[in-house]
Swiss-Prot record:
Coiled coil ranges: none
Protein name: Chromosome segregation in meiosis protein 3
Subcellular location: Nucleus
Record family assignment: Belongs to the CSM3 family.
SUBUNIT field: Component of the fork protection complex (FPC) consisting of tof1 and csm3.
Length: 267
């Protein structure tokens, strides 16, 4: 009996304890004010997340890497004027581009188009050949490219030697070339003199002006016309006092020549 009554007495509460259960002064507002907020409810989750991330183990927090977008290549003035651009086109064209000439126009045009296509594909692979040519044509209207193009054209022009620019006509030729040149000039003079004599012999001079024309002046006229076809070297070798007529004699010769021309045109 004693054993059975012990647990029962242990479970029964004291009268004071029972009174405390029903003796409270606690309002509804105080109860709602002590309710945990929503942010407080998330704190345990955040701490759990940090604990799972490995911060408690001394590990660094995971860094999120965002991939940067690669810049898109453009066919602009800078790319066109760079070394793979037009400068490379000019170098390779001088060294590799050869044409066969007449009778091979079609193959030469195909070779030229293939050359341009390979160059443009290496410069800007993103564009097709026709599209790339259209872009290059639009860029060619810019002031910068027009200025550089003029410079390239001036570079390709044949340069005049410094001797010619200084006004010196002296040209050093081999001895054989000078001999051939002298013989050719002499032959031209003889041919011109013969033609002049033939033309003068065909002139019809009326009787009224027969005395005004002196046959002794015909060699002088022939010699004067002959000098027009002389080379500069031969003319420079002539002596200054070779019996050249003075101004009055030149005027007389010119008047006689005009009279001859007028007579032939009137007849």
């Amino acid at each position: 009996m004693e054993d059975d009554s012990a647990p029962i007495s242990g479970r029964s509460g004291s009268p004071d304890h029972v009174d405390d259960l029903f003796n409270y002064d606690f309002g509804l507002d105080e109860l709602l004010g002590q309710a945990p907020s929503r942010t407080d409810s998330t704190e345990p989750k955040q701490t759990a997340t940090h604990a799972m991330s490995g911060l408690g183990l001394g590990l660094d927090e995971e860094v999120k890497v965002t991939k940067k977008r690669q810049p898109i290549a453009k066919l602009d003035e800078r790319r066109l004027l760079s070394q793979p651009g037009i400068p490379k086109l000019r170098r390779t064209a001088k060294a590799k581009l050869k044409f066969r000439g007449r009778g091979h126009e079609f193959s030469d045009a195909a070779r030229l188009l293939n050359f341009y296509q390979l160059w443009l594909d290496n410069l800007f692979p993103r564009a097709k050949f026709a599209d790339g040519l259209a872009m290059i044509e639009r860029l060619g209207h810019s002031k910068r490219l027009q200025t550089i193009r003029r410079e390239w054209i001036e570079e390709e022009k044949p340069q005049i030697s410094t001797d010619i620019q200084a006004g010196s006509p002296q040209i050093n030729l081999p001895a054989d070339t000078q001999t051939d040149h002298t013989a050719l000039a002499s032959e031209n003079r003889n041919t011109t003199s013969a033609k002049l004599q033939e033309n003068l012999s065909n002139y019809v001079i009326p009787d009224g002006v027969q005395n005004s024309v002196d046959d002794t002046n015909l060699p002088a006229l022939a010699e004067a016309d002959e000098r027009l076809f002389m080379s500069d070297d031969d003319f420079a070798r002539l002596p200054d006092d070779q019996g050249a007529p003075d101004d009055d004699e030149w005027d007389a010769l010119l008047r006689e020549q005009e009279d001859l021309v007028f007579i032939n045109t009137s007849t």
